Amino acid sequence: SGHAIPGHFGHAAIYVGTERQLRQAGVWDAPEIRKYHDAIRKGAMFIEADNKGVHLSTAALALDADAIAHLRPKGLSPKRKRQAVTEFFRRVGMPFDYYFDLDTTACTFCTELVNMVLPEMRLPQRRVYGRRLILPDEMAAATLKGRTGFAFLRYVSANRDHWQVLGRQALAADLRAAWPAPQRPPHVATMASR
């Protein structure tokens, strides 16, 4: 989906954990997860929704990007975390939503997947061509402003030669730079300049 959605970020992936982490959380033997044990043991620790549908991915695939905003849900109880992880695995195999429409339930796109499983994160929604959707850039911008249930942890920017860990101000500047002023989504447009 990174080529279909405008802006700085074109995708969102969910880290669900390693075998050790899933065991510690008490969900390793859940039926929704058991069938993916081999894939997890081979390094699949992310779930994402892209043109292949909802599937597991390794870090090498999920993090193959020029920029990554690392966000983490805040305030989830251990029980709610277990429910969410299990629910993400339950969605594996769901087809991709090429219309990017939050109102469809038989298919999903990346940020819609996050919203389906974690509605308490309060992701910003907008209407585009009559459809409700969630832009990854607005998800990041709203998080920087404290308007979602996510905590901002770090922003990593990279090119072919090097990578660097940057902060909130750099992320805000890159989000603004990705959108011409008249076309900026509301959460990006209202971010203060450095």
Model-derived features with residue positions:
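Cysteine-nucleophile amide-bond enzymes
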Residues: S1-R194
